[in-house]
Amino acid sequence: MKSFFLVVNILALTLPFLGAEVQNQEQPTCHKNDERFFDLKTVKYIPIYYVLNSSPRYEPIYYQHRLALLINNQHMPYQYYARPAAVRPHVQIPQWQVLPNIYPSTVVRHPCPHPSFIAIPPKKLQEITVIPKINTIATVEPTPIPTPEPTVNNAVIPDASSEFIIASTPETTTVPVTSPVVQKL
């Protein structure tokens, strides 16, 4: 890939000169005035960016378009650091030193106050009537459910003997339950 770009660069730089030599061979050798030996209309210079943009798959990734910024620009998110040039033997110097701001900034920065310092006037309350709160949600009280309790009759019936105690219990009847599914034969 690097060799391809090298060949394209060499061709782009030498093409005008090769065209000029071919054109000079066609013209007579005697020139009365000092003029250029090649015509710009016949030899078209193809700049390298045109070659790269005509075939975008060969465009290298490592050419990133970045804006040029000053070293000590106030809008940059980081500072540039430099190593100290002279090192004294007995003094401990930190490994990196921050470059001083040599060039003063041309843009005047206006301080933005913190939101806690901004005074907000309170809202004016006019003719507020107090509305009493009414509890619209009633408390739900559980309803007692009567349970049937078997009662024991302790009364003595004259016809029966005194040994038997009759207890009245509710009668239960059994009902056969049939399934609603119809069986197919």
Curated annotation (Swiss-Prot):
* Gene Ontology BP terms: lactation; protein stabilization
Keyword list, A-Z? Glycoprotein, Milk protein, Phosphoprotein, Secreted, Signal
* Signal peptide (residue range): 1-20
Q: Which domain of life is it from?
A: Eukaryota
Q: Tissue range of expression?
A: Mammary gland specific. Secreted in milk.
Which positions does the site annotation Cleavage cover? Answer: 117-118
Q: Name one GO cellular component term.
A: extracellular space
Q: Does the keyword Mitochondrion apply?
A: no
What coarse category fits the chief subcellular location reported for this protein? secreted
Q: InterPro entries of this UniProt entry?
A: Casein_kappa
Phosphoserine PTM positions = 161, 179
The glycosylation sites annotated in the UniProt record are: 143, 161, 178
Question: Where in or outside the cell is it found?
Answer: Secreted
Cited function: Kappa-casein stabilizes micelle formation, preventing casein precipitation in milk.
- UniProt family annotation: Belongs to the kappa-casein family.
Write the protein's name. Kappa-casein
Give the source species.
Equus caballus
Q: Which gene encodes it?
A: CSN3
